[in-house]
Amino acid sequence: CYEINGELLLIDCGVLFPEDDHPGVDLLLPHLDYLDDDKLSRVKALLLTHGHEDHIGAVPFLLKRRPDIPVYGSKLTLALVEAKLKEHRIRNYDLRVVREGDTAEIGEEFDVEFVAVNHSIPDALAIYVKTDAGSILNTGDFKMDQLPIDGRITDLRAFAKLGEEGVDVFMVDSTNAEVPGFVRSERDLAPAIEQTFDQATQKLIVATFASHVHRVQQAVDAAVRHGR
């Protein structure tokens, strides 16, 4: 949550899943009570980086309190959000689809630009926010896969351009940052998937995250090739 001159801008609104020491707990919600009625009335928009639960899972709980908050995100991200809003029976919401390279003036205080990043879910975006007090670049989750299945890479040129213009605060998501080495390209998994289908003589069960669309697509493509 960023606040300047009485206007508030939110970036992402997710949930966490409980660990073993939280028996009986389904979800861990953010402290939305920070947004009292006064602050909530001054929220100009909610910007979403991508469609994973830890970034969008709490959106329905926020919009239950004020459904008319404009929500910006990519087409896939907002499709996932809309499904959640319908499940929670929330109406009169305001979803605004954006693409990489798009800009938006939000309220009187925030100028926003969206930048393409690659991630394990398609349509992820980084968000650059410029204000009179300074600028913030929020990466969202990302990875450096130069050969992604959909050909959509992290736009390092756009990041370099923003760096030249000046970034006062760089907010970098750090999932697995403590793990040494580099993540493999999603495309590198294709031979292993193909080999598994070649060798399987009976029923084959594929387990993966439902949101890992590219991996699911590779499994479906392999199944079609093998007549399964």
Regions found by a protein language model. Name each.
Residues 1-47, 52-227:
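His/Asp/Glu-rich metal-coordinating catalytic cores
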